[in-house]
């Protein structure tokens, strides 16, 4: 089995006197919930706050770890299904990580309530890292594209005709 390499990252914190203090990483190695889980659970070490352009509170979930994604693969930081029990939503919906990125794994969540938000804590996974193969293709401008059954049908226009018949599969 190929290895996916992770590194702990120290971080700096501004003190009240304006100086910076280097803090040792408490980052946890991501883990699979089960042997067949597609994603690796990510845990936060700390949460910082930002305000977006619309004035909404954004929570930044830091992991204090970096990953070395092998060439030919891409990483996706995806929301956990438990997001439906929280009053936050990942800002980008999904984070895309190229194999050349070596910075901290983190995700930003927009608070969706004016009340005190229900959030993830440091003892529970807040997202999952999914690694999949990725073809690096050269963009080329052409005069025509090949024909397909769907053609130019847009959002929601490519729905197959409903046939709710259940067919028995014989082995």
Model-identified regions with their sequence ranges:
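Non-catalytic terminal segments and appended small domains
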Residues: 1-171
